[in-house]
């Protein structure tokens, strides 16, 4: 990869050193995750991913474990580093098979293809990956499961199904995007000497956030403050019988730091919401009320509309009013998007910032494109 090349040629860390660090991290991570390495089969290709695999076989052997290698690559295609690691393994007397071994293993380690794979897997390599998947053993992938496109997560003919993927320097995008994510199992990034700063200014690098990052992303609470200091959110959610959608979306607003949350919902939902979320302000409608809605829009710092809103005439009138009169940021989700798909020109009436949050089916309705085209 480019990150490897930068580290080798610009920083000066030799490729074999990176390979050694990778192998050490793979073995250590397997131990931390309680993967049984008592009897391991490492399936190696001809490239540097295969070199990592040969190094893993050596380290496991040095730890007193039984490690065999299935060499699935071609001698003529061996990279310099992979050839070196293979020679070391052979010098140590570790078994290197070229045919499927008739033995049982506690773990199968996939080191056939790395991030550079961009072609469909067929023939011998397909047979190897399919055979690995059939084995009754825990399965670990080196950097990315063989057969997954590192950039898109697409399956290139067939792919290794891992329980654990040990990713060098960072989790590859193909392990986060489906269907690749479902093949990667648990993806764990490990440091091997590639400077994280290398990724900081690259446009092809993506960042993911999890629950642990939430506190870092939200502004700190000031000691001299009150609930009015942290914004007023108007949730226009919940048609009759859809109190749950109104409740869950309001909870989300509180979770990300909203000070005041007002739910504008069908009157049938009032009692349930007052019991479920007594801290929220509940405003209700039985029929469309232009003046009431305009007053609420003036009150809000942020408007969220759509969750459980329904597809009826009242809901449609509410959405039209919001897009015409809202002056603060507006998030449109769920039924709000479905209503919008009937009349996308409504967006042209809105002068406020609008955020749309469609899933694939909603995006298909909005654009008129099939889900396959969008994907």
Annotate each PLM feature.
Residues 1-68, 79, 175-330, 334, ...:
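Small-residue (G/A/S/T)-rich helix-start motifs and N-terminal tracts that mark the onset
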Residues 55-134, 271-283, 291-299:
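N-terminal small/polar loop signature for handling phosphorylated ligands or for N-terminal nucleophile
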Residues 66-73, 124-145, 324-341:
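Short, acidic/small-residue loops that bind anionic groups at enzyme active sites
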Residues 105-107, 112-204:
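Internal gly/pro-rich beta-alpha loop/helix module
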